[in-house]
């Protein structure tokens, strides 16, 4: 007598193949593979296998990802569910400009992890700050997923969380990468501090800090080191929200090797330990002094700009007359007080105009108190450069646009939703790589010497181009001759056919 199945006939008719078994799980019909096995008794039985999909009543069998992959590899899948149209231009442009950065990553990380880090950073550079749970959608719809289709890495939330955790916990490869950047830099290094709002109550680094009232949320503090001459970032590091920059910078200086470096930093990094470390191993520093500094108060009482004057020319169109006073504190340390006469005169005129307009915040008493100190800079240095070079180095440091400034001001980098300590430091490294790629794009756009063209414009024009799958090849679509010519002037010529 044949045993009757408990599965309805209108479900059984969708059974995908032999050696499969349908199981009713409260109305959900799951399909499993099975195979016949000989039992110790000599009789035959079945051994249940893995889940291959489910049957939807009235619709049919729906294979899961694992079974689809198996069918595809065996050539048995009647149709392949895959993306046939991907974004191309902005990704290909950034990869063209930053191929050397991928090479550096491959020198420090296993090849597949280097590609995963690089893909993450390229997406961040193309779209600005993007939360970790949004990266996978960009990746799957981009030429990156075609380029790295034979790699096993994923770009989903869990996969990227593991990646960031590993980078932060097993930090030697990232440190090797950063040290290489430092060693190959111009040795003119600026260090800058930023405050970032944190929206994660569980973030190990998020605490109340000096900007908590303004941010309406806990904060983390980010310190960036970057090369003043080449305009590239060298190091990103996040610290506790309650930390102060002058202590955090000591940790950075002690954790990396710096030699024969000229540091240009702001007065938030002024501390005996930081200044000592910035003066060892052939290093020197330039730092502005706060008004509360005892030497500033002393010098102000009798200040006369008797040491000399010079013309400062930051570019071909701009110049300023600078007078200065210089004195030595010891054999290696000087204080130089600079006064930009043009800036001083400009601010005097502006303030007087505000007084004439009746602005309540302006008064003759305040004018008399402040007018002598507009455009005045008190700088302390252990550099042996002459005064004009010290001033030029200090002013040049403020002209650098870091990737953090770009995303903070233009790409909605307002808060982090990161909790894990290691993930936070892993993200620091992703930010560094993203900043490196962004600096390459900045340089390429700057070299166009077209004031009306920005990095946004270039990415937008390149972003129109797509690759569409035809047979086994990807073909370039949605191009415009004018855009192709502009991108070609940057050295980037889009591929018409991409074989993957």
Language model segments and positions:
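Dynamic "connector" segments at or just before major functional cores
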Residues: 1-190, 194-200, 222-237, 250, ...
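Secondary-structure capping and boundary motifs in well-ordered enzyme cores
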Residues: 115, 152, 187, 216-218, ...
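An anionic, glycine-rich sequence signature occurring as long contiguous blocks
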Residues: 218, 238, 282-396, 464-500
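Active-site beta-loop-alpha junctions of metal-dependent nucleic acid enzymes
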Residues: 237-258
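Short, surface-exposed basic-aromatic patches at helix termini and helix-loop junctions that form
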Residues: 254-257, 275-284
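Acidic, metal-coordinating catalytic cores used for nucleic-acid/nucleotide bond scission
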Residues: 264-273, 291-294, 423
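Short amphipathic alpha-helical "interface-anchor" segments enriched in bulky aromatics
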Residues: 389-418
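Basic, amphipathic alpha-helical segments enriched in Lys/Arg and hydrophobic/aromatic residues
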Residues: 418-442
């Amino acid at each position: 007598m044949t045993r009757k199945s408990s599965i309805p006939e209108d479900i059984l008719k969708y059974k995908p193949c032999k050696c499969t078994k349908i199981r009713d799980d409260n109305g959900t019909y799951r399909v499993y593979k099975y195979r016949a096995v000989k039992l110790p008794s000599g009789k035959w039985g079945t051994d249940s296998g893995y889940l291959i999909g489910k049957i939807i009543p009235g619709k049919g069998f729906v294979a899961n990802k694992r079974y689809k992959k198996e069918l595809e590899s065996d050539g048995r899948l009647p149709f392949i569910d895959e993306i046939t149209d991907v974004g191309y231009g902005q990704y290909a442009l950034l990869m063209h400009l930053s191929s050397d950065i991928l090479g550096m990553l491959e020198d420090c990380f296993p090849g597949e992890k280097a590609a995963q880090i690089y893909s993450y950073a390229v997406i961040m550079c193309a779209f600005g700050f993007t939360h970790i749970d949004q990266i996978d959608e960009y990746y799957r719809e981009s030429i990156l997923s075609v380029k790295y289709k034979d790699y096993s890495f994923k770009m989903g939330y869990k996969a990227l969380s593991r990646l960031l955790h590993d980078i932060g916990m097993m930090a030697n490869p990232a440190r090797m990468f950063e040290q290489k950047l430092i060693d190959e830099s111009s040795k003119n290094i600026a260090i800058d501090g930023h405050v970032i709002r944190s929206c994660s109550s569980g973030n190990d680094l998020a605490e109340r800090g000096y900007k908590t009232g303004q941010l309406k949320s806990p904060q983390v503090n980010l310190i960036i080191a970057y090369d003043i001459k080449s305009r590239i970032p060298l190091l990103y590091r996040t610290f506790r929200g309650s930390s102060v920059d002058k202590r955090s910078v000591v940790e950075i200086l002690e954790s990396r090797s710096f030699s024969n470096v000229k540091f240009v930093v702001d007065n938030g990094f002024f501390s005996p330990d930081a200044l000592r470390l910035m003066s060892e191993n052939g290093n020197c520093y330039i730092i502005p002094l706060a008004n509360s500094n005892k030497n500033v108060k002393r010098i102000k009482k009798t200040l006369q700009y008797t040491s000399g004057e010079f013309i400062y020319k930051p570019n071909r169109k701009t110049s300023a007359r600078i007078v200065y006073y210089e004195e030595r504190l010891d054999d290696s340390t000087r204080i130089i007080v600079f006064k930009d006469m043009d800036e001083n005169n400009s601010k005097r005129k502006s303030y007087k105009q505000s007084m004439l307009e009746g602005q309540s915040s302006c008064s003759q008493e305040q004018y008399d108190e402040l007018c002598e100190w507009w455009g005045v800079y008190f700088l302390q240095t252990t550099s042996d450069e002459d005064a004009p070079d010290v001033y030029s180095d200090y002013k040049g440091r403020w002209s650098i646009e870091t990737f953090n400034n770009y995303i903070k001001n233009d790409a909605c980098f307002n808060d982090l939703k990161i909790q894990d300590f290691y993930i936070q430091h892993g993200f620091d490294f992703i930010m560094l790589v993203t900043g490196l790629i962004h600096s390459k794009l900045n340089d390429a756009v700057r070299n166009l010497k077209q004031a009306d063209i920005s990095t946004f414009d270039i990415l937008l024009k390149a972003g129109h181009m797509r690759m569409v799958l035809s047979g086994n090849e990807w073909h370039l679509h949605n191009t415009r001759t004018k855009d192709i010519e502009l991108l070609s002037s940057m050295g980037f010529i889009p591929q018409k056919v991409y074989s993957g």
